[in-house]
């Protein structure tokens, strides 16, 4: 065998030579690669192998290589035990002596039990910094930020995962994520291998910041096993605090503005540059940057020592120009776009499902009786349930429930009427204003909401002033001077609505503040616009300027350009919908509509002069009506068969939300009249279950029958319940990709069978099981005009398949059934075969990807010999073989109606293909037989090049 050498010098195995000899023979290798001598000296002293005098001798050496040589001399002079311990140190302190890992593995060093019993103290700067970061993040992530500062809620006690979905570049679903650890998994959901950034998006309040806080906690406590040694967490809004002229190098950004190493920062930074893959960065809230930052057009800065503006450093970290290989997690609200070349994967947070909500109730209220009371009240009020699908709003409502329990002697009662988001925020404001009052052991606080808000008017005005000043500039962090200028007192700060930041501002010498959540800042901004009678019409309506037709909205921007990057605005094409990235304005408009609604006048007339209130209400309603009319007229329209279809944008969802906050039937009627179409398409609008309340509020005024397409949103079962007022008008209902379970299908069954007018029902890619399939069967049986049924990619097995097939068999109207991606198997296929036999109307059937094998396939083929209606049959991705191909060939000799037969990705060979091709000689009706992905070799497929109806590749 050829002898293998070492790059430095020949290695003498330790098992055949004393440890002293091993050190002597590899002396220059050790001198070259040992850079940290202090850690060695510390441990040799700790275990009494070195004396103080030995340590002084080492320290007196002028250069690092000299120190290493002196240590080696001293160690070897002290004998075999010390030499073995020296090697043990190199093995145990892996970060400090990372370059020696291959050598230690190659020599097969294995310490004795005596050596392993010795204490090793890790004073290596890199390891110390890792521990320092763990302590820092552990402290910051232990408690959840809470409204009331005197309360501290443990993250471990209240955190709960939400629905996490992997999505593609266009937000199409790629499947669910089951745990936070999967976020950093390098094998699932990868969109771009070259991308550096994992992008987490979701609506305000859906839990993006909490998710990052949970990740911090897991890493700090050693429960996130992802090979991460450095964890840097930044909130993007803090980058807005830097001045235009500020310049930092990467080391200063990480150390001076996050966590400074206790020892040898240069060595720590050098390790980070050399091994960037051991670092994890999280950047929370890209949408909260006070800049029209176009990440794809920021100047490159690939040198870690070159000073640059912090925003340039941020952009280059995300792109991988700086610290390429480090993991980066970036969060933003839905609507923010990040250049595709930056993205490694995208994750969409969808909030709480009904099962999440029940689990969260158990977490927040351990007492079973209390859980049952809360859940029964929520079930009785689907409007509240819908609000609770957003974790932040759920938490607020649950906190109010706790308050009612304490305030009303253990008999908590949530409101049983319709609640808007404005109601929720008014409620939490009232709760916390009351909690600041002195408590009495003998008398409950019985102040009315009017009295509570009147007593806290000055505090509300001061909070509103701070919020409004920030909102005008899209700023979310405030200096101490700005807070003091508003007149806020120390007792006001105890409410917890405005809180001190854990980190100091960029100057490092003054405290900064922020609102508990962006939605809270929007609420107090709206409150300020209502309370301050000096606010004129233009200022009142400022944030509505985005309610313009898409073509007009793209011409201006509320954001001042970020001066260092004039190219960020550029002269390129205008944005399609500038408003989509500015939810903080949208929430302000929403709360303004709620506060100025007729229902809130009794509450506000003691806070605002009557004349000012009338003036503001009049101005708001006039603007709301005209904006709504103009926007609806501008929406793109298209004629689809007998429908006049209008394609609405996400801005329309915000308009509906604002209309719902008014609770004005007049406004709802106006909106319904303005739609001027009988097919409303709201796909990919990121609508949640609470939005169904707003949609129903408008659509129940629609005078005619309507087609409604809500595919690819986030409605879940609560959203289906909220749509109940609309069902009497809906002929087309598309709810695919919406997290709907059997409970939601039950509601559909009950409601749609009341009116029996539905012709199209789309429920593709939900969470429907055999139980839900039976509810769909009822719809098929009783809705005699139903022509299209889409149930693909659910969880329906042969049992549910049999029920559905029987209903299809009995239907005289059904023309298209989609069952792709279920698991009906051979038994289900046989049932559908019976349905096909002599069916009068079914033209399209998809049983693709259903686990169908020989028996099921042959049954379908035999049935089609007695069918003259079916034109399209999809059997892609099953387990069909040549036996099935033979049966299908026999069928084709008889059936002249079938036009498209898809057998892609099955187990058919050249033999089965030949039989199908022969059958075409006597069939003039079929236009294609697709056999791509079967067991057919390219040379075998060449035989059929002239037969264009056989498609093999």
Curated annotation (Swiss-Prot):
SMART domains: LRR_RI
Residue positions of covalent lipid attachment, annotated as S-palmitoyl cysteine: 558, 567, 952
LRR repeats: 632-656, 702-725, 727-750, 755-778, 783-806, 839-862, 867-891, 895-918, 923-946
Organism: Homo sapiens (Human)
Superkingdom as given in the UniProt entry: Eukaryota
Free-text note on domains in this protein's UniProt record: The LRR repeats recognize and bind gamma-D-glutamyl-meso-diaminopimelic acid (iE-DAP).
Gene label: NOD1
Protein name, UniProt field: Nucleotide-binding oligomerization domain-containing protein 1
Function noted in UniProt: Pattern recognition receptor (PRR) that detects bacterial peptidoglycan fragments and other danger signals and thus participates in both innate and adaptive immune responses. Specifically recognizes and binds gamma-D-glutamyl-meso-diaminopimelic acid (iE-DAP), a dipeptide present in peptidoglycan of Gram-negative bacteria. Preferentially binds iE-DAP in tripeptide-containing muropeptides (MurNAc-TriDAP or TriDAP). Ligand binding triggers oligomerization that facilitates the binding and subsequent activation of the proximal adapter receptor-interacting RIPK2.
Entry keyword set: Apoptosis, ATP-binding, Cell membrane, Cytoplasm, Immunity, Innate immunity, Leucine-rich repeat, Lipoprotein, Membrane, Nucleotide-binding, Palmitate, Repeat, Ubl conjugation
Annotated consequence of substituting residue 208 to R: Reduces caspase-9 activation. Reduced binding affinity for NLRP10. Does not associate with cell membrane. Reduced NF-kappa-B activation in response to ligand binding
Tissue occurrence: Highly expressed in adult heart, skeletal muscle, pancreas, spleen and ovary. Also detected in placenta, lung, liver, kidney, thymus, testis, small intestine and colon.
Domain CARD: 15-105
